[in-house]
Amino acid sequence: MGGFRAMKVHVVDNGGQWTHREWRVLKYLKVDTKIIPNTTPFDELEGVDALVLSGGSPRVALETERMGRNGEYLDRAGFPILGICAGMQFMTNHYGGATAPAKVPEFGKTTLHVDDEDDLFVGLPRTFTVWESHNDEVSVLPKGFKVLAHSDNCSIEAFRIEGKPFYGLQFHPEVENTEHGYDIFKNFLKVVDSWMVR
């Protein structure tokens, strides 16, 4: 389906309503994948080539104890990580940035504007529809984070950590209402594929 070498990508369950959709997209793309509790020790992730940090319930990214070992994964991973919604917000907080209640909480369809295609948005339109479901948003980016996309109500919809294959998305690419969602996952898997040969 994706033309990638065999790879293992686990989805870290942070209690999000669409965690199974993330797993299902990866399965559809012929990736060896499973959902794991966010309490899984990093040392038990033997042979994993990448992680997807799922979304979670409202404000969960601010409640560190409910995010399990996500911080450990970020500190120790030498492979790509994609944080979605609460996963993205946790990444921001973990590296010294900040999240805050959104000026305009986003639920449903919104228009995404790609500012920098980087690797994640290669080959995609500069503007397309995505699905949102968040009360909080990234308010302060840590040093070394690069904004990749925004919407009219949210100035940071996607980022990359410079020098690392770590990405964050505020919107939900796994939801069918997001245009090009599968393509975003495919582009992430291309990053994983290229990282595997290093």
PLM segments and residue spans:
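Short, Lys/Arg-enriched N-terminal segments with co-localized hydrophobic residues
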Residues: 1-6
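Flexible gly/pro-rich beta->alpha loop and the following alpha-helix that scaffold active-site loops
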Residues: 8-10, 16-84, 95
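Active-site flanking residues adjacent to catalytic metal/cofactor-binding acidic residues
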Residues: 12-13, 171
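Pocket-forming structural segment of enzyme catalytic cores
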Residues: 68-84, 89-183, 187-191
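Generic C-terminal helix-cap and adjacent flexible tail
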Residues: 190-198
